[in-house]
Amino acid sequence: MPYIKPKLANIIHPVIMFKLTQGYEPAMEPSQLYAVTRGQWKMDVNRSKQFKYALACDAGLVVEVYEIETWHQSNETMSEAELLYRRAKGLHAGETGRIEFVGKIAPEEIRKKYNKTNVVKYWGRSQTPFKYISPENL
């Protein structure tokens, strides 16, 4: 199968990109990918509420797009199965001072725009596991 270079993302919506390092596996179940992406992050909850979409990213490529519905303090909304999975993968689980979102797969037109796109230019040299992208600030 020939290599197809992913198109470059053109972000026009307020998004938070999440760098999935620990716990991410390309063949994981959708529910596991959601659990890894949605929490638990050391972020400012008030700032995070300004962003509508979450981009789950691996190696500079968007692997899934979620529509963020609400933000919560860590451990408020995760199921026991999600917490067990996160602990088994060595991820933060139930720590204070962290937040998590509740959301769903983004609408198809949004997924089509961002899923499987290259977002390396937006990360720059940042080492943080998440990045806020406001189109008006680009």
Report each predicted region and the residues it spans:
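Compositionally biased, charged N-terminal/linker segments
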Residues: M1-Y53, D58-L61, P107-K113, T117-L138
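Short beta-strand element of the conserved SAM-dependent methyltransferase core
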Residues: F18, Y66, I99-I105
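A short pocket-lining beta-strand/turn micro-motif at the edge of beta-sheets
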Residues: Q50, V62-E64, G97-I99
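Short beta-strand-centered aromatic/proline hotspots
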Residues: V63-W71
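Short conserved micro-motifs at the rims of enzyme active sites and ligand-binding pockets
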Residues: E67, T77-M78, K112-T117
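Short leucine-rich amphipathic alpha-helical surface patches
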Residues: E69-T70, I105, E109
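Short, solvent-exposed secondary-structure boundary/capping segments
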Residues: Q73-K104
